[in-house]
Amino acid sequence: MSAFNWSAIAFILAAIALVVFMLVVPRLLGGRSHGSQKEEIFEAGVVGSGNARIRLSAKFYLVAIFFVIFDLEALYLYAYAVSVREAGWLGFAAAAIFITILIIGLVYELSLGAMNWAPADKLRKKARLYAAPAGFSLADITKFDGVDELMVDPTGKIPAQSSGQINVSNNIETNRRHLQNIDHINTTGNVTSVDFATSAQTDNIKR
């Protein structure tokens, strides 16, 4: 028999011996347990329970994408490594450019917070704005100088003010009263329901 045949036989025997070792030794040295817990399905460190159709965190896909990117990088660099002498400086420059592009992409992903999963990372995010900033006035934003600023649609009706809470009619005088009410919008974005023009006339009559 040739040396090639002997090496093939040795490889097959070593593979069989390894399988037998992994099956027999744990059975002889390992402990045994009995009961319902032995029959439970245990996979990836988690006891299976509940519905299998659950939401999977999208961060898992980020890890998978990173793995694919750098796995392919290692494959290409292996091809360069085995032919580094033949490739010369030109091959070195090409490999350096390739690695630089991947590093730039990795830094960009890290700057976007793609790998920030810890609770402490969430606390460092920008706090949500719950109050109006200084100098903010919704009344100034929605203020009209006159009824002529409102556009008339093809049906001849004047559209409502942008907040959708001011009733605008075809009566010009009614619209003027509504425009005075618009000037009293508070900073919370809620439109006041008081007719200030009517209230002012009532106050003048009482006086």
UniProtKB/Swiss-Prot annotation:
Q: Does the keyword Transmembrane helix apply?
A: yes
Provide the GO MF annotations for this entry: NADH dehydrogenase (ubiquinone) activity; NADH:ubiquinone reductase (non-electrogenic) activity; quinone binding
In short, the EC number is: 7.1.1.-
Q: What class of enzyme is it?
A: translocase
Read off the Pfam families from this record. Answer: Oxidored_q4 (PF00507)
**What UniProt keywords are attached to this protein's entry?**
Cell inner membrane, Cell membrane, Membrane, NAD, Quinone, Translocase, Transmembrane, Transmembrane helix, Transport, Ubiquinone
This protein's membrane topology, according to the annotation, is: Multi-pass membrane protein
Transmembrane annotation, as ranges: 6-26, 62-82, 87-107
Q: Where is the signal peptide?
A: none
Biological role: NDH-1 shuttles electrons from NADH, via FMN and iron-sulfur (Fe-S) centers, to quinones in the respiratory chain. The immediate electron acceptor for the enzyme in this species is believed to be ubiquinone. Couples the redox reaction to proton translocation (for every two electrons transferred, four hydrogen ions are translocated across the cytoplasmic membrane), and thus conserves the redox energy in a proton gradient.
Q: How does it assemble?
A: NDH-1 is composed of 14 different subunits. Subunits NuoA, H, J, K, L, M, N constitute the membrane sector of the complex.
Name of the protein described by the UniProt record: NADH-quinone oxidoreductase subunit A
Taxonomic source organism: Psychrobacter arcticus (strain DSM 17307 / VKM B-2377 / 273-4)
